Curated annotation (Swiss-Prot):
Residues 73-97 are annotated as: Disordered. GO terms for cellular component: cytoplasm. Residues 88-97 have a biased composition (Polar residues). The modification Phosphoserine is found at residues 87, 91. This is Leucine-rich repeat and calponin homology domain-containing protein 1. SUPFAM superfamilies: Calponin-homology domain, CH-domain. It comes from the Eukaryota. Interacts (via LRR repeats) with unphosphorylated DOCK8 (via DHR-2 domain); the interaction prevents the interaction between DOCK8 and CDC42. It holds the Pfam family CH. Its main location: cytoplasm. Keywords: Cytoplasm, Phosphoprotein. InterPro entries: Calponin-like (IPR050606), CH_dom (IPR001715), CH_dom_sf (IPR036872). It comes from Felis catus (Cat).
């Protein structure tokens, strides 16, 4: 029996030497058998379950993070303190500048002026000073007209000028025939109609314009007709006097 076994082994060795493909196949089969031994189904199940358990334990922190993120996105049972604790710390200077290093517009905005901080005494003094200047201008207007026309105007200067008669006589006194036709009251009709008053006022303003009074210093018709713009009228009359004085100096 021993001799027969040795003969069989020698025969197999000769066959393997003559057929190298068979040798490589046997070697690969033996390697497979050696590296991957066959085990029972129960052992494989236990190994798989153990492997799955290990994977489950290793991946459980990731799942918890995903669950926390899901709760945070849904806004359910996630307190602001937890969000603040989990969120990364941001320095105060991180948001001080916008893209490309530009500062937000709020940096350039000036603080709103507090109206309550204005001194009421200053407001009253400024108002009184303005009223004093206007009164002086109106008195100067009265003196200029009375001195040139040699008349005494009514105490209510606005009522004395509203029909435009005095103003037309003033411009004709400065430059004769500047206003060709003047509507004047008569004993029968002591008060002119509004249409005639407007015509006198418009003729006066047109004469001032022709004599060289700048447009920005010309008052409007309603400043005279409605007796609400004596300061504007005073500016117009003063400009008219200044223009005529300047022209007389250079002629």
């Amino acid at each position: 029996d021993v001799d027969m076994a040795m003969i069989e082994q020698l025969r197999e060795a000769v066959d393997l030497l003559q057929d190298p493909d068979r040798l490589s196949t046997d070697v690969s089969e033996r390697n497979v058998v050696n590296f991957y031994p066959v085990e029972s189904a129960e052992a494989l199940d236990l190994q798989d379950s153990a492997l799955n358990g290990q994977i489950q334990l290793e991946t459980s922190p990731v799942c918890e993070v995903q669950n926390d993120l899901t709760l945070q996105s849904n806004g359910s049972e996630y307190s602001p303190n937890e969000i603040r604790a989990n969120s990364p710390a941001i320095s105060p200077t991180a948001n001080s500048t916008g893209p490309f290093g530009l500062k937000p517009r709020s940096v350039f905005l000036r603080p709103q002026r507090n109206l309550e901080s204005i001194d009421p005494q200053f407001t009253i003094r400024r108002k009184m000073e303005q009223m004093r200047e206007e009164k002086e201008l109106v008195e100067h207007l009265r003196e200029s007209i009375e001195m040139r026309l040699k008349v005494s105007l009514h105490e209510d200067l606005g009522a004395a000028l509203m029909d435009g008669v005095v103003l037309c006589h003033l411009v004709n006194h400065i430059r004769p025939r500047s206003v060709a036709s003047i509507h004047v009251p008569s004993p029968a009709v002591p008060k002119l109609s509004m249409a005639k008053c407007r015509r006198n006022v418009e003729n006066f303003l047109e004469a001032c314009r022709k004599l060289g009074v700048p447009e920005e210093k010309l008052c409007l018709p309603h400043h005279i007709l409605e007796e609400k713009g004596l300061v504007k009228v005073g500016i117009t009359v003063q400009a008219l006097l200044d223009v005529t004085v300047t022209k007389s100096l250079f002629t």
